[in-house]
């Protein structure tokens, strides 16, 4: 069975439009990149389309050198007309910590800044990483979280690690196991889970023999192949369990949450 995230998307959309109407000025999101590959360019175009759909301002800045990128970030961080900054990653030839040194946490609407991740650990975050938050929203909408046995396959700083922290919060109280591609006997761990989150970046990693019948499988993977974009979950798993689609699942919710974070930043800046 395919999990339809459209009702959740529409709920977020309705609430977001109401918040935008209350603003006195139009929020602005700026994407910063350096030597983007075709897939990055394609993603930025879809991001721009999403921003325009909500009547939000959007601009792309492309640095001409690694130092140029850092200079752009520092300038945008000081610009009171900019509410959110999105940095494409990985950013070729640019050290990630140098990026964060030049990016003010209050405009890091992706929630990737060490300050924001640290606040997340204390349950005091202003921004959570968008993809991790998208997974939580889908889980809350589909199954409810307290007491659930959740296995996360993936340990990235943007999904696996922050998602584990978010699910362990007292108001969610999931039992969380974090695995990765080096985990031995992975199927013996995923088999007993109520929810499996596939976020390892490996096409078809999760197969039908690895999951419980009617369990929830959230596919975070985005893998570009000759067949198109596919996730980390084999297609036949949907005949046995409930699976989010790729594309049109987690990514759809992630994008609208990025816009929600932008509006949240604008509200804080009294726009």
From Swiss-Prot:
EC number of this enzyme: 1.5.1.5, 3.5.4.9
Any one biological process term the GO annotation gives: L-histidine biosynthetic process
InterPro entries linked to this entry: Aminoacid_DH-like_N_sf, NAD(P)-bd_dom_sf, THF_DH/CycHdrlase, THF_DH/CycHdrlase_cat_dom, THF_DH/CycHdrlase_NAD-bd_dom
Protein family according to the UniProt entry: Belongs to the tetrahydrofolate dehydrogenase/cyclohydrolase family.
Keywords associated with the record: Amino-acid biosynthesis, Histidine biosynthesis, Hydrolase, Methionine biosynthesis, Multifunctional enzyme, NADP, One-carbon metabolism, Oxidoreductase, Purine biosynthesis
Classification via PANTHER family: C-1-TETRAHYDROFOLATE SYNTHASE, CYTOPLASMIC (PTHR48099:SF5), C-1-TETRAHYDROFOLATE SYNTHASE, CYTOPLASMIC-RELATED (PTHR48099)
Gene transcribed to yield this protein: folD
Gene3D superfamilies attached to this UniProt entry: Leucine Dehydrogenase, chain A, domain 1 (3.40.50.10860), NAD(P)-binding Rossmann-like Domain (3.40.50.720)
Cellular component GO terms, alphabetical: cytosol
Task performed by this protein: Catalyzes the oxidation of 5,10-methylenetetrahydrofolate to 5,10-methenyltetrahydrofolate and then the hydrolysis of 5,10-methenyltetrahydrofolate to 10-formyltetrahydrofolate.
Catalytic activity as recorded in UniProt: (6R)-5,10-methylene-5,6,7,8-tetrahydrofolate + NADP(+) = (6R)-5,10-methenyltetrahydrofolate + NADPH; (6R)-5,10-methenyltetrahydrofolate + H2O = (6R)-10-formyltetrahydrofolate + H(+)
CDD domains: NAD_bind_m-THF_DH_Cyclohyd
Residues binding NADP(+), per UniProt: 154-156, 181, 222
Subunit structure: Homodimer.
One MF annotation (Gene Ontology) recorded for this entry: methylenetetrahydrofolate dehydrogenase (NADP+) activity
UniProt pathway annotation: One-carbon metabolism; tetrahydrofolate interconversion
Provenance organism: Thermosipho melanesiensis (strain DSM 12029 / CIP 104789 / BI429)
Stated name of the protein: Bifunctional protein FolD
């Amino acid at each position: 069975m395919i999990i339809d995230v459209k009702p959740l998307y529409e709920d977020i959309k309705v609430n977001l439009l109401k918040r935008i109407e209350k603003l006195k000025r139009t929020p602005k999101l700026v994407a910063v990149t350096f030597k983007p590959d075709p897939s990055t360019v394609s993603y930025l175009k879809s991001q721009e389309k999403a921003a325009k759909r909500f009547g939000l301002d959007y601009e792309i800045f492309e640095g001409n050198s690694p130092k140029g990128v850092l200079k752009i970030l520092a300038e945008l961080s000081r610009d009171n007309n900019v509410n959110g900054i999105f940095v494409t990653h990985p950013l070729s030839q640019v050290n990630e910590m140098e990026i964060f040194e030049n990016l003010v946490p209050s405009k890091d609407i992706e929630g990737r800044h060490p300050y924001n991740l640290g606040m997340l650990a204390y349950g005091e975050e202003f921004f959570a990483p968008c993809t991790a938050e998208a997974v939580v929203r889908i889980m809350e909408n589909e199954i409810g979280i307290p007491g659930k046995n959740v296995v996360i396959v993936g340990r990235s700083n943007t999904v696996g690690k922050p998602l584990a922290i978010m699910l362990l919060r007292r108001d969610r109280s999931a039992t969380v196991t974090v695995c990765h591609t080096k985990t031995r006997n992975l199927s013996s761990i995923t088999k007993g889970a109520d929810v499996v989150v596939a976020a390892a970046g490996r096409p078809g990693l999760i197969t039908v023999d690895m999951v419980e019948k009617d369990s929830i499988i959230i596919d975070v993977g985005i893998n570009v192949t000759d067949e198109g974009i596919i996730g980390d979950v084999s297609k036949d798993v949907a005949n046995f369990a409930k699976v989010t689609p790729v594309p049109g699942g987690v990514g759809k919710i992630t994008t609208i949450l990025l816009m929600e974070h932008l509006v949240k930043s604008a509200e804080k800046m009294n726009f």
